[in-house]
């Protein structure tokens, strides 16, 4: 741990998170707010903390995050991906447990585009025979 801070970029759906890890007491700041203030849902908070709990680093780093785009779920996933990438910068040996849990792989599922002649991506307009 020679560097003062470790950086990771995470993406999920249309959200992009930039994450900085700094050795500290475990304070997580998202867009200048605490984690509890930023995310109302408990599931989003749990998703953000998953890589830290898995690697037993929950109280060891102060985490500063800037996240933009998407909704709560996408932003939480982007932060999780960013924290994972930053943890890999801290210690490359953490790659095996994080990869096994599926945190290293970027979730590439994004919104399907709307097609012309259709109501949405797949739903057609109501069809009438007569």
From Swiss-Prot:
Ribonucleoprotein as UniProt keyword: yes
GO biological process: translation
GO CC terms in record: cytosolic small ribosomal subunit
Keywords, comma-separated and alphabetical: Ribonucleoprotein, Ribosomal protein
Highest taxon of the lineage: Bacteria
Listed NCBIfam families: PRK00132.1
HAMAP family, A to Z: Ribosomal_uS9_B
Family: Belongs to the universal ribosomal protein uS9 family.
Protein name: Small ribosomal subunit protein uS9
Lineage: Bacteria, Pseudomonadati, Thermodesulfobacteriota, Desulfuromonadia, Geobacterales
């Amino acid at each position: 741990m020679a560097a003062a801070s470790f950086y990771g970029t995470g993406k999920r759906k249309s959200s992009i998170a930039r994450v900085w890890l700094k050795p500290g007491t475990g304070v997580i700041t998202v867009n200048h707010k605490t984690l509890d203030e930023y995310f109302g849902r408990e599931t989003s908070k749990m998703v953000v903390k998953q890589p830290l709990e898995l690697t037993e680093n929950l109280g060891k780093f102060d985490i500063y995050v800037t996240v933009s785009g998407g909704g709560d779920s996408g932003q939480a996933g982007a932060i999780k991906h960013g924290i994972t990438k930053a943890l890999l910068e801290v210690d490359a040996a953490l790659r095996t447990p994080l990869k096994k849990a599926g945190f290293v792989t970027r979730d590439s599922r994004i919104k399907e585009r709307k097609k012309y002649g259709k109501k949405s991506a797949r739903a057609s307009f109501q069809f009438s025979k007569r």
